Amino acid sequence: MASMERRLGIVGLVLLALLVFGVPAAKAQGNPGAIKVTSSTATTKFAEELKFALQAQSSAGSIEKVDLFYTFGDGKASNRVPTEFTPGKVVTATATKRAQQGEFAPQLDIRYYWRITDSAGNTLKTDPQTVVYADDRFQWQKTGNDRATVQWYGESDSFGKQALGWTIEGLDRLEQKFGIRMSYPANVVIYQSKDDMSKALAPRGATFDKGATVLGEARSNYGTLLMLNQGDARTTLWHELSHLVLHDLVKGPYESNLPAWLDEGLAMYNESDNANDNYQRSLDDAIRKNDVFTVRSMTAPNGVPTKVGIWYGQARSVVRYLLDEHGGRDNMQIGRAHV
């Protein structure tokens, strides 16, 4: 009952904040034997491109249309990539998706399929294939289970097993504290240095990138979190897991409007019960100087390195107040009314 009330409390809090703030087998239409795929391949170049290639033929007419689609995560949305080919009974088609730095999460499984149509009206849709968008600068190791996968390099097998244990512990912690559980396995990608991870992150501006060290980043649309093996790695992991779980809870039309203070504040609240850390000290100092943020101004993250500690401390303080002081009851009523 307590966990259910807590879960509804989180739902209510979210709603309140939003209101106030190989050659694949084939599926065919028409003549099932008219179109045949003789080759289908995919390659990736990290932070540069994804390249797909197809060879196909039709016994019924000229192949007039070839489309390439890819998807990831829960697979509910497919993305189309323009193809290049010359129509004919036998075609070779290519499709290239440029990948900007940080656009895709590293070590991501990308599923893709082709849809081919000939002049006789036959359409073939291939079964999905998978290509890994790999950060090919490193030799990756991998371990996991049905709830999470951990990928790392430069450390022993025991490191990966420990990280997987932390991941499961963090997921259990979220379920016990808030009654919420991820609907898909978490993918944890661990880098060994800031320089190593920088190429996997989207640039945020020269000042921020130079002055701040990003210990972790949740890529909720990919079901992936990136983190550094530095400092208190378990705390970083739990923080980023909170982002994945919260975005999984509210995914849909409201997700893009989730205020940053709630997203980050809940992650800070979940990562540690320690209320006497550097973030709290930064916030206390800002309160004494009357230099805190308005909650409305915290709907987007703060990009000033000297203000980061205050911002995170204040986000946690707001969430702690809403959850601890008001508990699940008031928020539960909001959740029941709107879910």
Where are the language model's segments positioned?
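Bacterial N-terminal signal peptides
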Residues: 11-21
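Post-HExxH zinc-binding segment in Zn-dependent metallohydrolases
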Residues: 249, 256-299
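Bacterial N-terminal signal peptides that target proteins for export
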Residues: 2-12
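Pan-zinc metallopeptidase signature
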Residues: 292-336
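Juxtacatalytic substrate-recognition/specificity segment
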Residues: 139-259, 289-292, 300-307, 311
